[in-house]
Amino acid sequence: MAEATAITVPVERTAPDTIRLERLLDAPVDTVWRYLTEGELRAQWFAGGSDARADGELDLVFEHDNLSSDEVPYPEAYASHKGAVSHEKVVRFEPKRVLAFTFGEGRNGVATFELFPDGERTRLVLTHSGIQSPTGGLDFGSGWSSHLAVLAERLAGRTVRNFWELHARSRETVAKALEG
């Protein structure tokens, strides 16, 4: 098989309040869809909680400690997110094609995941719109970039030793991408 993921668009700002990321994942659409919608699988790369359903509520439980295979300290800057639960609304649900839900209980816009088959792989396009914070592009871009990297590793059957180290590298990469 090819690499676990190809970063086709690291992150780009498509509007003042919108960022877009694109990845080519080494897994079929059916598998990627399950990792987006099933709480137990989503917990392995992003946030657990309830399963996503059409026109449903979506509880996201953020347990970033579970994303690292090594025991690593939780950065002070993100301590307020440890164990956080957010209650989101699924606003678009097209099985194996599109999942969109509010973010930050609606205060931080909408995250939309689009899936496109590419042979035995999946092209995932993530668009986060309605970002209100002036630093939101960097904050959400680095968060999504690091979480998508974890997803790619999980799909390849691998673990991530230190999520927070990955997040720090993602933040640097995203900052450079959004400058240009």
Where are these regions (language model features)?
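Hydrophobic ligand-binding cavity/cleft-lining segments
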Residues: M1-D51
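Terminal "cap-and-tail" regions of soluble proteins that handle hydrophobic small molecules
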Residues: A2-T8, E12, A77-H81, G119-G180
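Residue-level signal for tight coil/turn positions that link beta-strands
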Residues: P16, A27, D55, E94-K96, ...
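Short beta-edge strand/loop motif at the mouth of beta-sheet-based domains
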Residues: R20, G39-G83, F163-S170
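Hydrophobic pocket/interface hotspot
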Residues: V32, R42, L58, V90, ...
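Hydrophobic-ligand binding "helix-grip"
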Residues: D51, H64-I131
